[in-house]
UniProtKB/Swiss-Prot annotation:
Residues 331-354 are annotated as: Disordered. PANTHER family: MITOCHONDRIAL DNA REPAIR PROTEIN RECA HOMOLOG-RELATED (PTHR45900:SF1), RECA (PTHR45900). It comes from Shewanella frigidimarina (strain NCIMB 400). This is Protein RecA. The gene is recA. One of its GO terms (cellular component) is cytosol. InterPro entries: AAA+_ATPase, DNA_recomb/repair_RecA, DNA_recomb/repair_RecA_CS, P-loop_NTPase, RecA-like_C, RecA-like_N, RecA_ATP-bd, RecA_C_sf.
Length: 354
């Protein structure tokens, strides 16, 4: 297509002026952007990393993790923090619920001596701390636990029973507008944990909704719905939860996939169990009867023993992990552990299931 040379000259001049005024990279042609390969941080679960499509949660974006009580929301964010710290990144935890257990965090691999932690008095204070940490450019991951606990100052200073219609939603909406650009510039990952509420009078579809208004749904690049699907027992004792995570919104890869994994009490995500399951599903690990073998050598009778073998042999576990990531993240995962949900209606903009 023939382009007017005068227009080309005018465009070059205005682009130069914009870059001089606002900095290099403030405007560019989409196809020329070499920075569009999104940097990610592992969630601690290989199957969830695969379901997300990019290998983890994206840096410079907003992520929302929501679900019922005791479904593993905080555990998942602590696993992300541990993974980020292993890469030498600085992390912060805004504990609005005042419920963070440092002993449990340490068990999950979090370096609590180097984890920044704040227990703010009001929702505005929590979001201002988020913004200040983001603008510093020195913090890589910020977790806010939780949106429901971000109480506006007016509500705290008022009396119980006073009506404060829409205060939290307005506060979140203003914060999202302010934070989104700063997060992109500083390449900081901001994770909001959220709770579920029930909408009154809903006759059709799911009555569930999340707190804090609609702004977070729109600004979030990734929304994860985490649910406990069953209990893991050792004899009569419950030792963990079977967990399912649905990627209900994803702006960095194909959405609507899901991952299933185990969360063991006091240990976190059962990574070796995932490696065994995914290894068998993709023919890296052979299963004959109850026996599991890798490259012709038996590694254990039963899933638990195979997982124990991988725990005791981290080199082999790392080899299986690396091979699975290369297979499934480059070519796309079509296994049952990262399948697309097609039996539900989903709002394509917000990722809301209805």
């Amino acid at each position: 297509m023939k382009v007017d040379p005068n227009k080309e000259k005018a465009l070059a001049a205005v682009l130069s002026q914009i870059e001089k005024q606002f900095g290099k990279g403030s405007i560019m042609k989409l196809g020329e952007d070499r920075t569009m390969d999104v940097e990610t941080i592992s969630t601690g679960s290989l199957s969830l990393d695969i379901a997300l499509g990019a290998g983890g949660l994206p840096m410079g974006r907003i992520v929302e993790i929501y679900g019922p009580e005791s479904s593993g929301k905080t555990t998942l964010t602590l696993e992300v923090i541990a993974a980020a710290q292993r890469e030498g990144k600085t992390c912060a935890f805004i504990d609005a619920e005042h419920a963070l257990d440092p002993i449990y965090a340490k068990k999950l691999g979090v370096d609590i001596d180097n984890l920044l932690c704040s227990q703010p008095d009001t929702g505005e204070q929590a979001l201002e701390i988020c913004d200040a940490l983001t603008r510093s450019g020195a913090v890589d991951v910020i977790v806010v636990d939780s949106v429901a606990a971000l109480t506006p100052k007016a509500e705290i200073e008022g009396e119980i029973g006073d009506s404060h219609m829409g205060l939290a939603a307005r506060m979140m909406s203003q914060a999202m507008r302010k934070l989104a650009g700063n997060l992109k510039q500083s390449n900081t990952l901001l994770i909001f944990i959220n709770q579920i509420r029930m909408k009154i009078g809903v006759m059709f579809g799911s009555p569930e909704t999340t707190t804090g208004g609609n702004a977070l749904k729109f600004y979030a690049s990734v929304r994860l719905d985490i649910r406990r699907t069953g209990a893991i027992k050792d004899g009569d004792e419950v030792v963990g939860n079977e967990t399912r995570v649905k990627v209900v919104k994803n702006k960095i890869a194909a959405p609507f996939k899901q991952a299933e994994f185990q969360i063991l009490y006091g240990q976190g995500i059962n990574r070796t169990g995932e490696l065994v399951d995914l290894g068998v599903a993709h023919k890296l690990v052979d299963k004959a009867g109850a026996w599991y073998s890798y490259k012709g050598e038996k590694i254990g009778q039963g899933r638990a023993n195979a997982g124990k073998f991988l725990t005791e042999n981290p080199v082999i576990a790392s080899e299986i992990n690396t091979t699975l990531r290369a297979m499934l993240l480059n070519g796309g995962a079509n296994s049952s552990d990262s399948k697309t949900e097609s039996d539900e209606n989903i709002d394509l903009e917000t990722g809301e299931v209805f």
